Amino acid sequence: MRFDPASLIDLDRYPIDRPDSGAFQRLLTSVQKDLDHSGCAVLKKFLNDDGIAAFVAEAENAAPQAYRAFNRTNAYFTKDDATLPTDHPVRQFFDRSNAFIPADNFKQGTALRSIFDFPPFDPFVKAALRQDKFYRYADPLADVIVNMAEAGNGFPWHFDTNNFTVTLAVQNADGGGAFEYVPNIRASGENFAEVQKVLEGRSDKVKTLNLEPGDLQLFLGRNSLHRVAPLSGETPRYVAIFSYVEEPGMVATPERAI
């Protein structure tokens, strides 16, 4: 079945297909204001009910093809540094479980691929993020994927290695899974003391965001510490990830592809 992306997106509320309209400019201004304020913008119910249902069906159908990985990582995705004190944030490692459904499970015409290929989508995201260098990730296994997390899974506190992420909530778990973040905690320096407070559960600067199916999120995660709280229940959490990079033709290195 081939999907028309215009039938999956709430274009009345989010007129990304009408860039010359006043409604589009108001939307763009609102998103950019949120990004400037907290590094996070959410377009609630960007997908309509039909779009959500189509995304869930595709994710469930492809879930058996998910690749799973388990490791321990710190917030910086770096190795341990024995020259630092044992309680230093760089030396705090946490279990990380990750499962993703590769992009080759979402062929042209599927709901997920239709949104990614919708001609107005990329220009809107680029304009919202105000990115001059903005290219689609060229990796055929990772340009648009679905992250899958199950009971006990989550994503510990970390900083992103890229400037921004573009994600779309597809299905929530029965419990847990809140998106927690500290905006711009290291915008002007590493700020290790405050990072340590977050890691130890002592910070009063943590914001909590409960994303719902159909929500599109733009997030500036390089300087904002964030995590996905552990999940519970039988229902898996699905989140679609649209991947963009700063150079054309980029694909994963062998190390990143494992």
Name every feature range the model reports, one short phrase each.
Residues M1-H37:
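Fe(II)/2-oxoglutarate
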Residues K107-R113, D122-L216:
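Catalytic core of non-heme Fe(II) oxygenases with the double-stranded beta-helix
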Residues T165-L168, L218, E234-G249:
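A short hydrophobic beta-strand segment most commonly corresponding to one strand
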Residues L47-N48, E58, A62, A66, ...:
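Signature of the catalytic double-stranded beta-helix
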Residues F192, A229-L231, V251-E255:
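Short conserved micro-motifs at the rims of enzyme active sites and ligand-binding pockets
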Residues F155, L225-S232:
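Short beta-strand His + acidic residue motifs that chelate non-heme Fe in jelly-roll/DSBH
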Residues K45, G221-R222:
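Conserved "cap/hinge" positions at secondary-structure junctions
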